[in-house]
Amino acid sequence: MILYGPPGSGKDTITNELTRLRADFALFERLKTGPGRTTGYRLTTIGQIEELARAGGLLYRNARYDAEYAIDRRGLAALVDTGRVPVLHMGQVMGASAVAVFPLHWVRVVLWCPLEVTEARSIGRGDTDVYARVKAWHETREDLLAHETEPWTLTLRTDQMSPTESANAIIDALSAPASAESRNIRELVG
C-alpha cells in the first residue's frame, strides 16, 4: 500500500485508522538519518544507507527537510513475511514507481488536500518548520502535474472525507480487483 501526498494530507492519520480497522496493516518505517521527527522511522547513519545502496538493498532513497530517507528491500520483506500489509508513506512519484518492483499487490493512493489545509494541519500539530511543509506541498503538486499520467488506484481528498471514510475506501480498493489507472490529476490539485 502506497500513500502518496503532501505534508498534512493525512498519511499518518489514515495509517493509524487503517491499523485500527485491520490488525494486518502496519506502517513501513523508512530508514532515516538527520534532524526532525523520529517517530515512524528506523534511525540509521548515512554510512549504513550508502552501504545498502552499494549492495543493491534499497528500493528508493530521497532527501528532504535536511534529512535522508530510504526504503530497504530487507525491511519491507521482513514486514511482508510476518503477514502484514505494509503502508508506505511517499512524497515523490518517482519513489512510488520505484517500490513497485517489489513483488506485492500495490494499492497506490493519492491523498490530497488544499494548501491552506496543509498549513493549518502543520500548525495544529506543532510543526516548527511550517514553511518547509508548505514548500513541500508545492513540490508535491508540481511532481503530480509532471507525472499526471502515472497510474493510481485511488485519489482521495482528505479535507472532504473523514479518516475512517478514507481508510474504508482504501480497504475496499485492496479487497477488490482494483487496478491502478491514470486519474484527472489537474482537476484534483487545481
Predicted features along the sequence, with ranges:
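Post-Walker A helix-loop "phosphate-sensing" segment adjacent to the P-loop in P-loop NTPases
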Residues: 20-29
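Walker A/P-loop
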Residues: 12
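ATP-dependent small-molecule kinase phosphotransfer cores
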Residues: 30-86, 90-93
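P-loop (Walker A) phosphate-binding loop of NTP-binding proteins
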Residues: 6
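Conserved phosphate-donor/acceptor-positioning beta-strand/loop module used by diverse small-molecule
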Residues: 87-91, 102-124, 156
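Small-molecule kinase domains that catalyze NTP-dependent phosphoryl transfer to phosphate-bearing small molecules
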Residues: 96, 124-190
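ATP-binding Walker
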Residues: 9
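Hydrophobic anchor at the beta1->P-loop junction of P-loop NTPases
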Residues: 3
